[in-house]
Swiss-Prot record:
The gene is HBE1. GO terms for molecular function: haptoglobin binding; heme binding; hemoglobin alpha binding; metal ion binding; organic acid binding; oxygen binding; oxygen carrier activity; peroxidase activity. Red blood cells. The modification Phosphoserine is found at S14, S51. Coiled coil: none annotated. This is Hemoglobin subunit epsilon. PROSITE patterns: GLOBIN. Heme b binds at H64, H93. The epsilon chain is a beta-type chain of early mammalian embryonic hemoglobin. Signal peptide: none annotated. Belongs to the globin family. Heterotetramer of two alpha chains and two epsilon chains in early embryonic hemoglobin Gower-2; two zeta chains and two epsilon chains in early embryonic hemoglobin Gower-1. Pfam families: Globin. InterPro entries: Globin, Globin-like_sf, Globin/Proto, Hemoglobin_b, Hemoglobin_oxygen_transport.
Amino acid sequence: MVHFTADEKVAITSLWSKMNVEEAGGEALGRLLVVYPWTQRFFDNFGNLSSPSAILGNPKVKAHGKKVLTSFGDAIKNMDNLKTTFAKLSELHCDKLHVDPENFRLLGNVMVIILATHFGKEFTPEVQAAWQKLVSAVAIALGHKYH
């Protein structure tokens, strides 16, 4: 279990409260699909993923990205109990979707890039460290069923 300090929790929640989940979610998932094209195989029903502009403009990518980031909001509400929070999603991604758990780590890293892009100077090294800790812990929780 990962322990978050009070300062880390403040760093995470203060930025999250300013986050446009719909915009950032679509951007994060879209960037994942562009930068790591092998991840596209999990989204074969999303239609045109043939180019970066097609991916970033794809309404299904945007909608699923919003869903992903919305569930990430659950992590922020339950930072002290991530394994339980993501137990069902871990099971779904492992047993039914067969997603390589490494992809969770990649998505977390993309999220950190999105945060840095959106928040600029507000995304200090301390804030980045807190977020990196969170996205790593979420990736571990999502990969839990694989072990």
